[in-house]
């Protein structure tokens, strides 16, 4: 088991105001936030805000002072990060004349990371510190437990509301807590994604063995919580990555050493698959593009494995020449280096360029892997056997390619199925990979021949997750696809500059078979031509799901949301809503109410199944879906009979009799007897404190105006028809039902159901179509998904289906 890297320095007191070095202020951050925190539109910059604060806590752990980090997503949209480290220094900074805590929060590049005495190595994705988080937050609250006292400070838009103040005794607490709300002035999206945060925090937990990281999501009625703690470090990380694969040797190979003031940790494990997964980190920061540490690792690995194969006589016996690619087939590895002053190719630190790191990594891997191979001959023989099999398959694939070149369907001639375009510039050319000959025929007739090519593929293509290169090249569909693209395949052959199209568009049916074929194609491109994805060349077509016909007019709708929009538009024609007060809503006022009702319907749909949505809806109208209700029990008790009365008005006469009560600390409980069976509906503290309840509560003033009492109800009038409306959900359903009258709705399952002109109008026309661009955010997560869905093991696939079955929406 790998030992933690942390060694507490002897004098914790050295970390004080004197350690804080100031470089410059924060104005530039607000003007160009993307330079400091990443993209402010796609969510990456938003999550980097959390990582910046977490990195400070992890730095405390690396220095040996913190053991637990808590990250909590709050119902109001804010995020709290807390650690049990030393606490940010609170004494006065001599150079600035204010507390060191205020300096750290308001000055760019201020912190202990610039003082080697405070932190030997430190993380931080952009190296800009928590001050940027403060600058880009609507508000930030800082609590510090240090030297027996609790200190508090608040900031609005990056500026201190008041100086740091002592608000009480720390008792047995120590550490720092930062709670911040991202500013809507900077970020177009301010909702944190649990899975994104979990992925990064899990990495940090693996890389810092012994540190506990707790991620908690309090935004919903049921708390979601993950406790991440891994004593095994990089060894356990590799086991986690390979959890769905069959290992070739019993345990991963662990290598760890400290040289030239750098720490190198590496774990590697071979499995029976055909793909390489190597994750690289410098000071806990991931390098997606590798760098000098990866180059050192690969050089040493190739040298030692091929050297052992030669010296043991196995390679000579099999008469094969081994390459680095052969050595890395089926390899999963995690390489982590701790470097005092690393240099990267860009601000986002995607590639390490510190030249001094390569010889250190190469030396450690050379020495320790050589020893392991000599000390474990039986396991080494298995590894070398796998490498030789890879070399033999590579040689067979090379011969298959040679045969292909000499055949009639060689590289020089394009497949007969391909309907090519006239344009020869790849940047202006598109290739549609279409499922089946019928859809292929429509696409060929409907396309713009000038720049759009069509390649129909019949049947399901080979699952490349379970196939070596030689088997892959024997597949007719794969061969046709490779030839059409023009790039070749394999490490030695693949040439991105020979790609004939810079838009490769997967176009399959909207049924189960179409989804399967799309997944098989994505597997092929991800495993064999990932550079196409990295360069943004791969897309998925989004043909419409619906065709609407009303009278002589026809319209195509791409998804359920577009269908709802259409039904609302038609349902509101000649429609009014008369409230119990006598006021009549129509036009834009009624449209806004229906749009709000749709939001409420969606929020109610998202609630846990244990909650009665009708009861929650009526409670929302009465404005009791908030935690403040616990502070005003009198109001809560008074609301109970009104909610019960409203529920009776919604029920059939034989199913009435709702009764309720409110208990402080618990919430509301409503019940009724239906055919001798008691039905119970609870609105507990978890629901009342959730973000969903908070959002529903925001609609209360509007809902109380529209639905002030259960009787008489509001009346929706359309032409000669009147419908009773008791709440927002019934309003939305009545309007969309009205919109369906006189409308012929056709749902497309297959592309072959469209004629060429329809396919052009909806899916091929560059001015009208919608496409999804394929990208990979987290390589290890993508590997896991392909392992689970396309790999040999059935159990992970079964568990995946069980977990996600209810969320699936596919046509059989």
Name each model-derived stretch.
Residues 1-812:
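Conserved phosphate-chemistry cores used by DNA topoisomerases
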């Amino acid at each position: 088991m790998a030992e933690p890297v942390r060694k507490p320095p002897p004098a914790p007191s050295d970390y004080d105001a004197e350690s804080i070095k100031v470089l410059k202020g924060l104005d530039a951050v607000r003007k160009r936030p993307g330079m400091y925190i990443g993209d402010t539109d796609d969510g990456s910059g938003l999550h980097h805000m959390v990582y910046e604060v977490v990195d400070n806590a992890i730095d405390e752990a690396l220095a040996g002072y913190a053991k637990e980090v808590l990250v909590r997503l709050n119902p109001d949209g804010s995020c709290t990060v807390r650690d049990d480290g030393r606490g940010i220094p609170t004494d006065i900074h001599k150079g600035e004349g204010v507390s060191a805590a205020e300096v750290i929060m308001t000055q760019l590049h201020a912190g202990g990371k610039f003082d080697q005495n405070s932190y030997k190595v430190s993380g931080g994705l952009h190296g800009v510190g928590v001050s940027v988080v403060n600058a880009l937050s609507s508000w930030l609250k800082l609590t510090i437990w240090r030297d027996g006292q609790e200190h508090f400070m608040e900031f609005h838009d990056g500026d201190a509301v008041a100086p740091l103040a002592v608000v009480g005794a720390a008792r047995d607490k120590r550490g720092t807590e930062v709670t911040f709300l991202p500013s809507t002035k900077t970020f177009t999206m301010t909702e944190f994604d649990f899975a994104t945060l979990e992925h990064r925090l899990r990495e940090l937990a693996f890389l810092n063995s012994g540190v506990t990281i707790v991620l908690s999501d309090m935004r919903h009625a049921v708390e979601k919580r993950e406790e991440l703690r891994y004593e095994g470090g990089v060894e356990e990380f590799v086991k986690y990555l390979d959890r769905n694969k069959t290992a070739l040797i019993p345990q991963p190979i662990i290598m760890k050493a400290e040289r030239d003031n750098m720490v190198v940790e590496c774990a590697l494990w071979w499995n029976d698959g055909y793909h390489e997964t190597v994750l690289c980190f410098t000071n806990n920061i991931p390098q997606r593009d590798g760098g000098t540490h990866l180059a050192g690792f690969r050089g040493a690995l190739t040298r030692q494995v091929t050297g052992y194969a030669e010296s043991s006589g196995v390679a000579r016996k099999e008469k094969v020449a081994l390459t680095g690619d052969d050595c890395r087939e089926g390899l999963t590895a995690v390489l982590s280096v701790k470097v005092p002053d690393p240099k990267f190719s860009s601000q986002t630190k995607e590639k390490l360029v510190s030249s001094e790191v390569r010889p250190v990594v190469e030396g450690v891997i050379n020495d320790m892997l050589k020893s392991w191979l000599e000390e474990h001959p039986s396991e080494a023989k298995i590894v070398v056997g796998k490498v030789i099999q890879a070399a033999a398959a590579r040689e067979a694939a090379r011969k298959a390619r040679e045969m292909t070149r000499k055949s009639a369907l060689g590289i020089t001639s394009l497949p007969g199925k391909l309907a090519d375009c006239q344009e020869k510039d790849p940047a202006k050319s598109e290739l549609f990979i279409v499922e089946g000959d019928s859809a292929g025929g429509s696409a060929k007739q409907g396309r713009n021949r000038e720049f759009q090519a069509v390649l129909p593929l019949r049947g399901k293509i080979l699952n490349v997750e379970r196939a070596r290169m030689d088997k892959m090249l024997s597949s007719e569909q794969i061969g046709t696809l490779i030839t059409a693209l023009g790039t070749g395949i394999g490490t030695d052959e693949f040439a991105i500059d020979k790609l004939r199209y810079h838009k490769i568009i997967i176009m399959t049916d909207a049924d189960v078979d179409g989804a399967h074929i799309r997944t098989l194609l994505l597997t092929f491109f991800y495993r064999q031509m990932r550079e196409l994805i990295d360069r943004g060349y791969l897309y998925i077509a989004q043909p419409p799901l619906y065709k609407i016909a009303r009278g002589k007019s026809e319209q195509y709708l791409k998804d359920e949301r577009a269908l709802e929009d259409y039904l609302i538009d038609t349902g509101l024609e000649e429609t009014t809503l008369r409230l119990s007060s006598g006021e009549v809503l129509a036009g834009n006022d009624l449209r806004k109410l229906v749009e709000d009702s749709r939001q409420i319907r969606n929020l109610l749909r998202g609630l846990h199944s244990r909650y009665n949505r009708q009861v929650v809806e009526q409670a929302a109208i009465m404005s009791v879906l908030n935690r403040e209700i616990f502070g005003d029990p009198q109001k809560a008790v008074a609301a109970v009979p009104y909610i019960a009365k409203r529920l009776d008005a919604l029920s059939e006469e034989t199913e009435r009799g709702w009764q309720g009560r409110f208990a402080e600390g618990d919430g509301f409980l409503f019940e009724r007897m239906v055919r001798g069976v008691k039905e119970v509906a609870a609105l507990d503290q978890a629901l009342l404190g959730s973000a969903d309840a908070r959002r529903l509560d925001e609609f209360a003033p509007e809902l109380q105006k529209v639905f002030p009492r259960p009787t008489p109800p509001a009346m929706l009038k359309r032409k000669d028809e009147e419908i009773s409306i008791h709440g927002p959900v019934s309003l939305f359903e009545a309007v969309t039902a009205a919109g369906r009258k006189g409308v012929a709705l056709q749902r497309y399952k297959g592309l072959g159901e469209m004629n060429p002109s329809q396919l052009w109008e909806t899916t091929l026309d560059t001015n009208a179509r919608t496409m999804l661009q394929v990208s990979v955010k987290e390589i290890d997560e993508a590997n896991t998904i392909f392992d689970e869905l396309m790999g040999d093991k059935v159990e992970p696939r079964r568990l995946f289906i069980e977990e996600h079955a209810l969320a699936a929406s596919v046509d059989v």
